[in-house]
Amino acid sequence: MFLAFALSTKAMAKEPKGTLTLRVMTYNLRYGELASLEQLAAHIKAFQPDFVALEEVDCFTKREDTPHQHNKDFISTLAYETGMFGLYGKTIAYRGGWYGIGLLTKHPYINMEKVLLPNPENKEPRALLYATCEVGTDTIVFAVTHLDVNSSKTRALQAETISRQLEKSPYPVVIGGDFNAPPSESTIAKIMLPRWFNATDNAPTCPTWEPKVKIDYLFCRPQARWQLITTQVVQSRLSDHLPVISTMQLLPRR
């Protein structure tokens, strides 16, 4: 397996007392077409993340182009192989099984919820999946999404729905996902960035063989309580997206 690490550091500071440090990853798996689940799990596990947001996650499907993944439960296998808890959110029935998004968490979860996102053009359904997790003495909401690929207007509606839903949380929130939008699009520039802490940089994440565009992100709220320590786009060929992993700190309430 070829791995090269492109590390960019955006902030370095002494850790205040009571600060919580988290390592979080987002990874679009391309429904396991380019790698085995064991390879993907080993790749994830190597970074020892606290949370992983996963997109294009199959369960019991039988795709013609992925015979090596037939009838496999992606999230359960990845959870077992990484030693993490796994949560799954189906978005569509597909090829004898389901297709959707998932979460891996090193920390126990209290509850979870799936919210279907606006779909005005009646295209592929999209969802927000989130879980409330206990991290030591702290409580964190961790979320994943995968926005519409066709319409910037639909993506903006979906991002607005996500923001409004998660802004209700009494706890700090981290969301990762494939937003299918470059940083300049209103989905990111006018909806996410003004209201969320950006826990990545603008390094391109897709496609793996010649990265040209950034569409994979990690965001946190409330903005004032988060500090980014490192962020990296990992060069690998196990999917058509490059995984993004960031280490961030949740600062104490002032």
What are these regions (language model features)?
Residues M1-A6:
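Bacterial N-terminal signal peptides
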Residues A11-F51, F85-Y88, I92-R254:
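Active-site regions of metal-assisted phosphoester/phosphodiester hydrolases
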Residues V24-T26, A53-K62:
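Acidic/histidine-rich, surface-exposed loop or edge segments in extracytoplasmic proteins
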Residues C59-K72:
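Short, flexible/disordered intra-domain loops and linkers
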